[in-house]
Amino acid sequence: MKSLEEAQKFLEDHHVKYVLAQFVDIHGVAKVKSVPASHLNDILTTGAGFAGGAIWGTGIAPNGPDYMAIGELSTLSLIPWQPGYARLVCDGHVNGKPYEFDTRVVLKQQIARLAEKGWTLYTGLEPEFSLLKKDEHGAVHPFDDSDTLQKPCYDYKGITRHSPFLEKLTESLVEVGLDIYQIDHEDANGQFEINYTYADCLKSADDYIMFKMAASEIANELGIICSFMPKPFSNRPGNGMHMHMSIGDGKKSLFQDDSDPSGLGLSKLAYHFLGGILAHAPALAAVCAPTVNSYKRLVVGRSLSGATWAPAYIAYGNNNRSTLVRIPYGRLELRLPDGSCNPYLATAAVIAAGLDGVARELDPGTGRDDNLYDYSLEQLAEFGIGILPQNLGEALDALEADQVIMDAMGPGLSKEFVELKRMEWVDYMRHVSDWEINRYVQFY
């Protein structure tokens, strides 16, 4: 949409009665206000008002100013699974200015750094999710009782039994402009992935939030729990949000170089950007894998099906899914992020890390073509390959020690993020689990 008049006609033509003024909190969870369509201009000018203190991560006290969500007209779209509704993505404003605690605003700041060089970061985010249900005791299981194969990846029967959900989700997302190009059953029972075409990184993050909104609500209509939780089952692979990326100048990819002697098709710019990602990987873990549960996914070793698919090893390689960064020809795939991350914040942190690598001309070293799951920690250390933090506490330590990533987040947001995540870590460490009760009560 390019004008208010065009947008109003669009809403009238599609019988839209309400517009959801939507943004995300610090956790990447969608927040909305439902606004009658006749007041669209209000969202575009003054914004929809929210009590800032009621939103995670705003840093606004109960006696502080309102958080005003001002819509970006180009993001207006229908919500096909919710007839009569449209969605408008908003940026947070406080006292008339873009708010530095808003993660979409933070991403725009990093995008501006790229724009100064004439660059655009394009990303393709890959959503993995689990379709689940709870039994009468509250325990969680795959929704499909027949989905029990030890190696279920790409299973025909498994994907076919969920076709009502997958088809409605796909059709809804296509209607709002996502170019869905493949759907598959992943390597855990009840786990699926849907891929759609890449976009500039801001639109890509907007699309990912739309995907999660659609998947959760369409599943709910069918009595299914659609979860992006990183590791719902301890003995099965977890849910990632792999981030494919390349930088372009509006004419061509600046990451691709067919003369690359390594055969990976990467330019010097891509290698330096990659060097920055590897150098800042421990701190990136806190932002890209920001929950206690995230680190159940990022363990070293194998699973029942042969691999965890976890990117626990700080290395890169040609089409190597055992490394932190896989190299499909001419681009990077960062395998670290999971479905619990805030895509705006994760992307902003990745840009900051990559640009630091470019500024310092960091060398990522030689790529690894071997299966890193085969090696012990001692062998990996001999190779000079580090591993990611193995719990949220370690990741937060790495984040606080990394001034590049902290600066990219900004002083207020970084402080708020670390404080909230420290609270989560402490709550977890104080919790007495069933595992502990079963193991220790009678033993001692």
UniProtKB/Swiss-Prot annotation:
One Gene Ontology term from the biological process aspect of the record: glutamine biosynthetic process
UniProt cross-references to Gene3D superfamilies, sorted A to Z: Glutamine synthetase, N-terminal domain, Glutamine synthetase/guanido kinase, catalytic domain
Record carries keyword Ligase: yes
Induction and repression of expression: By methylamine.
Domain (GS catalytic) ranges: 103-444
EC number assigned by the record: 6.3.4.12, 6.3.1.6
Known uses: Could be used for theanine (N(5)-ethyl-L-glutamine) production, by coupling the reaction with the ATP-regeneration system of yeast sugar fermentation. Theanine occurs naturally in the tea plant (Camellia sinensis) and provides flavor to green tea. It also has several favorable physiological effects on mammals.
Annotated control of activity: Formation of theanine is repressed by a high concentration of glutamic acid.
Molecular function (Gene Ontology), one example: ATP binding
SMART domains reported for this sequence: Gln-synt_C
Any single Pfam family the record assigns to this protein: Gln-synt_C
Signal peptide coordinates: none
Domain of life: Bacteria
Protein known as: Glutamate--methylamine ligase
